[in-house]
C-alpha cells in the first residue's frame, strides 16, 4: 500500500462531507461503549482485532481520547499481570466498506494519518511517562471499523519492534488519567436504564401501590382544575315541616356540561 504525503492526506480528508465526519464520530463513541462492555481481555481482543489468534494475557484498563503532546490517542489499553506488561495505543478509523481497498484514496489517506498519529503518540509516552522500575512495552494498533456494524475490517500493528519504557503501573495510570478527556468519560459513564421486563418480554409498569398513589394525586389535581364540578352547598334532604319527607328530585344533578 503506497503511503501518500502529508499534503495529499490533508487534501483528501478535507473533502469528506460533514455528514460522513459526524457518522465517524458516532462510530467512535459506539466503539468506546462496546469496549467498556467487555470484562475479559480475550473478548475485548476479539472485538478489536481482525486476527485474534493470540490475545494478550492479564487484566486491562481503558483510557479514551488521551492527549499525548499534539496528538490525541483514541484509546490506550494497559495490560498488566501477564508475562510482559504492555501499553497499547489504539488509533481508530471508520469506513462504510467491509474491506480495506488499497487503491481507495480516502482509505490510504486514513491509514497514513493513523500511522503518523501512532508514531507521535508512542514517542511522547516513551519520553514523558514518569520513570519507574517496571519494564513496559508500547505497542501501536491501527484499526479500521465499519461504521454500521463496528466489525473490524483491517488491523495493523506498525513498527518492527515495540518501544520499551521503564515506569510503573500506578504511575502510568495516573499519567494517562490526567490526560484523558473527562467529558468523553462522563458521556460513556451514562448508561441508559433498561425498562423492567416480565418473563414474556413485556415491559412492566409501576407497582399497584405506586399506581394507587399516582391515581389519587392525579384525581385530586383534576377536581381542582375543573370549575364546573358541582360542590355540595346544601344538605342531602330538607323538610318543610317536621315529619314531612322531602320530595324526591326530578332527576340527578348535573355534574358538568
Curated annotation (Swiss-Prot):
Chief localization: virion
Compartment(s) where it occurs, according to its Swiss-Prot or TrEMBL record: Virion; Host cytoplasm; Host nucleus, Host nucleolus; Host Golgi apparatus
Ranges where the record places region Disordered: 193-257
InterPro entries: Herpes_UL24
Cleavable signal peptide: none
Keywords, sorted A to Z: Host cytoplasm, Host G2/M cell cycle arrest by virus, Host Golgi apparatus, Host nucleus, Host-virus interaction, Modulation of host cell cycle by virus, Virion
Single GO cellular component term: host cell nucleolus
Induction, per UniProt: Expressed late in the infection cycle.
Any single GO BP term: symbiont-mediated arrest of host cell cycle during G2/M transition
One Pfam family per UniProt: Herpes_UL24
Role noted for this protein: May participate in nuclear egress of viral particles. Plays a role in the dispersal of several host nucleolar proteins including NCL/nucleolin and NPM1. Since deletion of host NCL/nucleolin negatively impact on nuclear egress, UL24 supposedly acts on this process through its effect on host nucleoli. Induces cell cycle arrest in host cells at the G2/M phase following by apoptosis. The mechanism involves the inhibition of host mitotic complex cyclin-B/CDK1.
Recorded family membership: Belongs to the herpesviridae UL24 family.
Annotated protein name in UniProt: Protein UL24 homolog
